[in-house]
Amino acid sequence: MKKTAIALLAWFVSSASLAATPWQKITHPVPGAAQSIGSFANGCIIGADTLPVQSDNYQVMRTDQRRYFGHPDLVMFIQRLSHQAQQRGLGTVLIGDMGMPAGGRFNGGHASHQTGLDVDIFLQLPKTRWSQAQLLRPQALDLVSRDGKHVVPSRWSSDIASLIKLAAQDNDVTRIFVNPAIKQQLCLDAGSDRDWLRKVRPWFQHRAHMRVRLRCPADSLECEDQPLPPPGDGCGAELQSWFEPPKPGTTKPEKKTPPPLPPSCQALLDEHVL
C-alpha cells in the first residue's frame, strides 16, 4: 500500500509554536539508577545521562531544544557509532533528537523517543564540522525523490549506507527506521552480507535521517520491548507494499487519544511537576 507523503520539515516543527507537555517542565534528569519505563511511545526514564555536546566524532544539533538526554546505553551507543564512523573516515555524525531529561511525550514531531532509547541521526556526513549557526538551524538533505520511489542518486553515497550498516550491526540496536526508498536502495547495494538488513525498517518520512532504537536494558524491568522484526532481510513483498497504490476506500486513520501513562511515570510526574 502506498503511504501518504508527509513533508520533511515536519521533523523540524518548532516547539515554540506548540503547547508544552508536562514533561518539558522537568529540566534535569530524575536522580536514581537508570531505568527506562514503559513503551517507546508511552513512557519515561529515571537516571538519564546527558550526551556531551562536545566531541571530535559527532556534533549535536538544536541544543537549544534540550533533547540530548537518554539512557546511558544510548549515550554509549552514540559515542561508539561515531567513533567507528570516524575511524573509517566517513565524516562527522550529526545527532538530532534523543529525549527530554525525564523522557515522556514531546509537544510535537515525535510519538516515540519517550524512554531514552531512541535517537535521530542525520543521513549526511560532513567532512567539515558545522558552525554553531548550522547546528542550531540544521538544513536536512532530502535523499528521496519527489515521487518517493527511489533515492536521489546525486545525494546518495556508500558512506551513508556504511553508517546505517554500522548502526544495524550494533548488538544493542533492535530497529532502524528509514524511508522505504532508502531501505530499497540498501537492499540493492547490500550484496551477500544481508543479515543486518533485518533491523532496517521502512517507515513514514525519514527522508533525511534515521531513527535508531535500542533494546530495553536488562535491568529496566518496567521497559516494554517490541517484538523482533520478521525473519529475513525485509527486501521482498513487505517492502514493495510501501510502493503500491492505496486500496479503494482507504481513509486516513483518526488521531488516537494518548493512552494512560505507566503508573511509575505518572508517579514521577506527580512528584516533580503536578
From Swiss-Prot:
* Compartment(s) where it occurs, according to its Swiss-Prot or TrEMBL record: Periplasm
Primary enzyme class: hydrolase
Please state the span of the N-terminal signal peptide per the UniProt entry: 1-19
Query: Cofactor(s) for this protein?
Result: Zn(2+)
| Superkingdom per UniProt | Bacteria
EC number(s)? 3.4.24.-
What SUPFAM superfamilies is this protein classified in? Hedgehog/DD-peptidase
Residues that hold Zn(2+) 2 according to the record: 147, 150
Where along the chain is Zn(2+) 1 bound? 110, 113, 120
In terms of InterPro entries, this protein maps to: Hedgehog_sig/DD-Pept_Zn-bd_sf (IPR009045), Peptidase_M74 (IPR005073)
Listed Pfam families: Peptidase_M74
Q: Which NCBIfam families match?
A: PRK09429.1
Q: What is this protein called?
A: Penicillin-insensitive murein endopeptidase
